[in-house]
Amino acid sequence: MISKARKQEIILKFGKNPKNTGNTSVQIALLTEDIERLKLHFLKNKKDKHSMRGFIAKVNKRKKLLNYLRINSFDTYKETIEALNIRK
């Protein structure tokens, strides 16, 4: 789970103000933070299949949001993937 301080930091960076939590870029950044944390968890706990299901759901949700952002605002999409370093 992401700490409140880290979550607020991400919201300010990608949402431009503290109340803008529904912004697609903010949602993608928060999901990316969760995904990175879960990757480390799976290195230690290879047989944790229950958490793997949630991990896959988060990856798919991020993928859908990235596709939405790419279609509706390509410039924001490019900025987001460069800032998060998730695609080449």
UniProtKB/Swiss-Prot annotation:
GO terms for biological process: translation. SMART domains: Ribosomal_S15. GO terms for cellular component: cytoplasm; ribonucleoprotein complex; ribosome. The keyword Kinase does not apply. Disulfide bonds: none annotated. InterPro entries: Ribosomal_uS15, Ribosomal_uS15_bac-type, uS15_NS1_RNA-bd_sf. Keywords: Ribonucleoprotein, Ribosomal protein, RNA-binding, rRNA-binding. Signal peptide: none annotated. GO terms for molecular function: rRNA binding; structural constituent of ribosome. The keyword GTP-binding does not apply. SUPFAM superfamilies: S15/NS1 RNA-binding domain. Part of the 30S ribosomal subunit. Forms a bridge to the 50S subunit in the 70S ribosome, contacting the 23S rRNA. Belongs to the universal ribosomal protein uS15 family. One of the primary rRNA binding proteins, it binds directly to 16S rRNA where it helps nucleate assembly of the platform of the 30S subunit by binding and bridging several RNA helices of the 16S rRNA. This is Small ribosomal subunit protein uS15. It comes from Mesomycoplasma hyopneumoniae (strain J / ATCC 25934 / NCTC 10110).
